[in-house]
């Protein structure tokens, strides 16, 4: 839920703009009791009183679209992956212990490993992720997180492919569309919008995502698997 100071900040604005109807509803439905510091009795309520409008971010349809054209660099890299079925995760790995980071990246990795361990011909997971930067230090920290989670799962584990660094929009669209990428997946539970999920849908491949957050504005049960 939004913090009380966030609601107070919104009420200092003439107009508030958010990227999704989901986000707008969260703020509109958020109500806090105002308590008297001495009597500890309720003396009122804190809620958003200023206008809020939704500005849908959208995606560039000239870039994000279904395609069968791929750069030689991507083709060469993807040939190094023996699996013909991979899930793609695109998103930051934010602060917080397992199950507590906003995008739930660590839990996605753990559940994937637990689900497909000891399976014959398991799928792989491609993780296009980073922390705060694209530095070598950040890359090493993410690699350590992956290894730490792998140590908690016993058995013959499926492969994890870690992709770190900034890609052009056109390169990301090629990733979404590559034939080895069969579906896009995320456990996120804190999206204001969820741009990578929208971009991924434009490849016309399945998207598996949580049924809570800004992306429910454009991900529907008939075109996505909402967990």
List each language-model region with its residue ranges.
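Donor nucleotide-sugar binding/catalytic pocket of nucleotide-sugar-dependent glycosyltransferases
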Residues: 15-73
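Conserved catalytic-core segment of nucleotide-activated headgroup transferases in glycan assembly
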Residues: 61-174
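Nucleotide-sugar-dependent
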Residues: 99, 187-194, 216-217, 227
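Acidic donor-binding loop of glycosyltransferase active sites
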Residues: 174-192, 202-206
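A short, histidine- and acid-enriched strand-loop-helix "catalytic/donor-clamping" loop
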Residues: 1-5
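Short hydrophobic beta-strand element within catalytic cores of glycosyltransferases
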Residues: 206-209, 225-226
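A conserved, positively charged/aromatic
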Residues: 7-14
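Short glycine/serine-rich donor-binding loops of glycosyltransferases
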Residues: 194-197, 212
